[in-house]
A protein has these predicted regions:
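Short helix-perturbing small/polar motifs within transmembrane alpha-helices
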Residues: 32, 46, 50-51, 71-97, ...
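Mid-bilayer segments of alpha-helical transmembrane spans in multi-pass integral membrane proteins
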Residues: 98-114
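Short, highly charged, low-complexity non-transmembrane loops/tails of multi-pass membrane proteins
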Residues: 161-178
């Protein structure tokens, strides 16, 4: 039962929000509409990739750190192949997602250290031997993932507003020149 709980927490509050955040960032960088079916398919593909690669890491097929590089590399290939996004924009969006994820995880870790204390936080993060410890660690990641999605949504809406403003200025310039 605890294995199922960990699996569900990891998927619903870990892989899916991070995949959605990466997809939102990709769509922001390329000025695509989030309401499209392609966004949801991209999120699903990104989630599946992350689940498979992280599972390979969890069963010691991949060393720590390499799983992130592999996941991001495949995300870039999906963005180029499936989403038809130019390579540089794909790379920029995934790297920007990585920066956002790192920042939100640092903010969350700092907050948890303030709340629980450094020693307790370190114990929570290092207790991966027991199923309870792994569940606690997964739950501790939820605030960072929520914050990550909020940050990339803000980024998306700022980019959309800037694009709208630019289009309005161009339309105004054209109408003035007529």
């Amino acid at each position: 039962m605890k294995t199922l709980i960990l699996f569900l927490v990891d998927i619903l509050f870990g892989y899916v929000p991070q995949a959605a955040g990466c997809a939102i960032c990709l769509f922001a960088v390329t000025n695509q509409n989030l309401r499209s079916r392609k966004f949801w398919l991209t999120t699903g593909i990104f989630s599946a990739i992350a689940i498979v690669i992280r599972t390979a890491y969890n069963i010691n097929l991949i060393d720590f750190g390499f799983h992130t590089i592999i996941i991001w590399s495949i995300f870039i290939l999906v963005a180029i192949g499936y989403n038809k996004v130019p390579a540089m924009r794909s790379i920029c969006s995934i790297l920007l997602s990585g920066i956002f994820i790192t920042d939100t995880e640092l903010i969350t870790a700092g907050s948890m250290i303030l709340i629980f204390g450094s020693e307790n936080f370190t114990k929570m993060m290092n207790d991966t031997e027991t199923m309870d410890g792994r569940i606690v660690k997964a739950i501790c990641g939820i605030p960072a993932n929520i914050l990550f999605v909020i940050v990339v949504l803000v980024f998306y809406f700022i980019k959309a507003a800037l694009k709208r403003r630019k289009l309005q200025k161009e339309a105004q310039t054209i109408s003035e020149n007529l």
